[in-house]
Swiss-Prot record:
This is Disintegrin and metalloproteinase domain-containing protein 23. Residues 1-10 have a biased composition (Polar residues). It comes from Homo sapiens. Keywords: Cell adhesion, Cell membrane, Cleavage on pair of basic residues, Disulfide bond, EGF-like domain, Glycoprotein, Membrane, Secreted, Signal, Transmembrane, Transmembrane helix. Gene3D superfamilies: Collagenase (Catalytic Domain) (3.40.390.10), Disintegrin domain (4.10.70.10), Laminin (2.10.25.10). The gene is ADAM23.
Length: 832
């Protein structure tokens, strides 16, 4: 799918053409703030008038910072020339575009002059100011440009006024963020970089969203549940004498975020009726509190972006501008992923090929993906995924390609993406990252089932192509959940430290001088955290290991992340942190599925599981006779791969690592594309007919999943690797400690993928040799202020009764004494 804007040309100025365009007023979108004052002249009519006026640039004078902008907007002399060039480019773009997407009449465009809202001395209200720069004024204190933590902008377009309230997205860059470029053939590294990337909302519009960068004008988008608006500055139309910078703004229908989508994280997949036809997405119910679910827990995808040489040349041969473009794109992607997938996209590095391309740039994305995968293995920076942005037009049906489910892998956690406008690249990058996360493309036949029919914008992973979509369908979200449940994405659970900016309360990262930081208010429990300080008596404010009523750590051994399968490891609280430990799984080679499978990369690999994943729940692996009979023949029906036009015979030792043979195949695979036809084969063996069918099923990255997966068992203590059957010991994995009897982890634990012992419930130590007493896993409930006990009540009652009796008896005795005195007092008058 190639989104609009994937071409390197500037966007068209439709909706403000100088001939034949309607310049009448337009109705504003629902939820936008109507412009005050008299009706505003439409931008196209204003442009015609201003272009006919004598040039005013020479008479303009630079004003001091903070001076008010004049009431009339000002356009410089180059505007008309550049608008003509842009119009020509628009015609060329629409005539020559290879995209399979039709430009919709619903898209509208205008020219606007945005302004930043500031406060003047002795004024209580904001006023518009034409300078859009958000750099803090006292830069000499810092070794890099520092931008304001908060900013507001006013944009008038389509008959409405929008006020955008922004907060610096301090979750975008990690503390280890580095920028790389080349000089004299050698890489040059620099820590940090300019950070001008904001998230926010439209003032007064509920559930609105904004993602903008302000490094060089305004780049990005905002939406109000009805329309999506894309904004960027017009190139070469602005100079220092200008009183305002023209921007082009596009309006198109937004994806409708239904209530079901907003509440999706609280629902179980098997509650949706359409999933009866998506059985492969279903998994067992998890006996764990949903608040500790692996999908609901926030995840962090650490991303590295690489820009090719043509992308660098496009940005005026400035690696700073090129890097800013990449950061702007990732800022947009992060705004999509964190809301719908509970996943933050954190940029750890940007590399720009300033001198030459480091790999061959071709129009064949499959070839380029394979070459880039080899290059990625030479990169030293840690990243969960590395993606290339290339200013090339692929001879391919889509604008990106990545390895399906490849995140966390140094060889497969990569992707290649076409360059274009920021919003278009953000959508392309969202799609290729989704492929890395096990999310499939959605053919049009699945669109009604996946709930992508509510809006013109469609969904991100639609195969037919959509324009500026920001919505993942139900199917996509369930596939991501399924990917996590199968053990994928283990690297996504290590929370990176906050970026290099100064400490700021409210960004969601606990920094120097802070005890807690709620970020968005919903991230903290109750009253545990106030102004980035823990409340009196509180030990924590958030996380699966923080008691949400007492604000105390859960006890050591309290389960905080359930194992999602036999090859996963349950994580337990440490007793001294509110956060759950990193997500680990068993080391490759452990037996699973009743000794029928082997753990590999956190998944239980069996031929049955692979057949069901490709062909549905009724499929199963064929009888061993099929593999021994067919894979030794070296034909289309059975082989160990292909060398040119020749099928490779499997040795008898490797027959279970060759062509995948299954029973009960469906007409079409659940993933990938069928290459050729299904090869039905059957034999009469030991008094019964056995099914030995197979097929070549190819993913977009050219991977043929019609062969037995790596990690699948092929004999006692043996597993497949690169279509060879190898001893597990030959994999040279790091080993965990052994006891004197040679038992791993003393026989009281399992070895993790980090070669550390995860001990059983009552054992501890690096080798699990120390007996640990049973822990209290159920912390006492918060009972509030302690009241009197039953014993104290009884004692108090008895004491009270004795005291009352004493008072009564004493009073009676005193009264009796007085009676006696009155009876025998000789001075007393009257009868007795």
């Amino acid at each position: 799918m190639k989104p609009p804007g994937s071409s390197s040309r500037q966007p068209p100025l439709a909706g403000c053409s100088l001939a034949g365009a309607s310049c009448g007023p337009q109705r504003g979108p629902a939820g936008s703030v109507p412009a005050s004052a008299p009706a505003r002249t439409p931008p196209c009519r204003l442009l015609l008038v201003l272009l006919l006026l004598p040039p005013l640039a020479a008479s303009s004078r630079p004003r001091a910072w903070g001076a008010a902008a004049p009431s009339a907007p000002h356009w410089n002399e180059t505007a008309e020339k550049n608008l003509g060039v842009l119009a020509d480019e628009d015609n060329t773009l629409q005539q020559n575009s290879s995209s399979n997407i039709s430009y919709s009449n619903a898209m509208q465009k205008e020219i606007t002059l945005p302004s930043r809202l500031i406060y003047y001395i002795n004024q209580d209200s904001e006023s518009p100011y034409h300078v859009l720069d958000t750099k803090a004024r006292h830069q000499q204190k810092h070794n890099k440009a520092v931008h304001l933590a908060q900013a507001s902008f006013q944009i008038e377009a389509f008959g409405s006024k929008f006020i955008l309230d922004l907060i610096l997205n301090n979750g975008l860059l990690s503390s280890d963020y580095v920028e790389i470029h080349y000089e004299n053939g050698k890489p040059q590294y620099s820590k940090g970089g300019e950070h001008c990337y904001y998230h926010g909302s439209i003032r007064g519009v509920k559930d609105s969203k904004v993602a903008l960068s302000t490094c060089n004008g305004l780049h990005g988008m905002f939406e109000d549940d009805t329309f999506v608006y894309m904004i960027e500055p017009l190139e070469l139309v602005h100079d220092e004498k200008s009183t305002g910078r023209p921007h082009i703004i596009q309006k198109t229908l937004a994806g409708q975020y239904s209530k079901q989508m907003k509440n999706l994280t609280m629902e179980r997949g098997d509650q949706w009726p359409f999933l009866s036809e998506l059985q492969w997405l279903k998994r067992r119910k998890r006996a764990v509190n949903p608040s500790r679910g692996i999908f609901e827990e926030m995840k962090y995808l650490e991303l590295m972006i690489v820009n090719d040489h043509k992308t660098y040349k496009k940005h005026r041969s400035s690696h700073a501008h090129t890097n800013n473009f990449a950061k702007s794109v990732v800022n947009l992607v992060d705004s999509i992923y964190k809301e719908q997938l509970n996943t933050r996209v954190v940029l750890v590095a940007v590399e720009t090929w300033t001198e030459k391309d480091q790999i061959d740039i071709t129009t064949n994305p499959v070839q380029m993906l394979h070459e880039f995968s080899k290059y990625r293995q030479r990169i030293k920076q840690h990243a969960d995924a590395v993606h290339l942005i290339s200013r090339v037009t692929f001879h391919y049906k889509r604008s990106s390609l990545s390895y399906f489910g490849g995140v966390c892998s140094r060889t497969r956690g990569v992707g290649v993406n076409e360059y274009g406008l920021p919003m278009a690249v953000a959508q392309v990058l969202s799609q290729s990252l989704a492929q890395n996360l096990g999310i499939q493309w959605e053919p049009s036949s699945r669109k009604p089932k996946c709930d992508c029919t509510e809006s013109w914008g469609g969904c991100i992973m639609e195969e037919t192509g959509v324009s500026h979509s920001r919505k993942f369908s139900k199917c996509s979200i369930l596939e991501y959940r399924d990917f996590l449940q199968r053990g994928g994405g283990a690297c996504l659970f290590n929370r990176p430290t906050k970026l290099f900016e100064p400490t700021e309360c409210g960004n969601g990262y606990v920094e120097a001088g802070e005890e807690c930081d709620c970020g968005f208010h919903v991230e903290c429990y109750g009253l545990c955290c106030k102004k980035c300080s823990l409340s009196n008596g509180a030990h924590c404010s958030d996380g699966p290991c923080c008691n949400n009523t007492s604000c105390l750590f859960q006890p050591r051994g309290y389960e905080c992340r359930d194992a999602v399968n036999e090859c996963d490891i349950t994580e337990y609280c440490t007793g001294d942190s509110g956060q759950c430990p990193p997500n680990l799984h068993k080391q490759d080679g452990y037996a699973c599925n009743q000794n029928q499978g082997r753990c590999y990369n956190g998944e239980c690999k069996t031929r049955d599981n692979q057949c069901q994943y490709i062909w549905g729940t009724k499929a199963a692996g064929s009888d061993k006779f099929c593999y021994e009979k067919l894979n030794t023949e070296g034909t289309e029906k059975g082989n160990c791969g292909k060398d040119g036009d020749r099928w490779i015979q499997c040795s008898k030792h490797d027959v279970f690592c060759g062509f995948l043979l299954c029973t009960n195949l469906t007409r079409a695979p659940r993933i990938g594309q069928l290459q050729g036809e299904i090869i039905p084969t059957s034999f009469y063996h030991q008094g019964r007919v056995i099914d030995c069918s197979g097929a070549h099923v190819v993913l977009d990255d050219d991977t043929d999943v019609g062969y037995v997966e790596d990690g699948t068992p092929c004999g006692p203590s043996m597993m497949c690797l690169d279509r060879k059957c190898l001893q597990i010991q030959a994999l040279n994995m790091s080993s965990c400690p052994l006891d004197s009897k040679g038992k791993v982890c003393s026989g009281h634990g399992v070895c993790s993928n980090e070669a550390t012992c995860i001990c059983d419930f009552t054992w501890a130590g690096t080798d699990c040799s120390i007996r640990d007493p049973v822990r209290n896993l159920h912390p006492p409930k918060d009972e509030g202020p302690k009241g009197p006990s039953a014993t104290n009540l009884i004692i108090g009652s008895i004491a009270g009764a004795i005291l009352v009796a004493a008072i009564v008896l004493g009073g009676t005795g005193w009264g009796f004494k007085n009676v006696k005195k009155r009876r025998f007092d000789p001075t007393q008058q009257g009868p007795i």
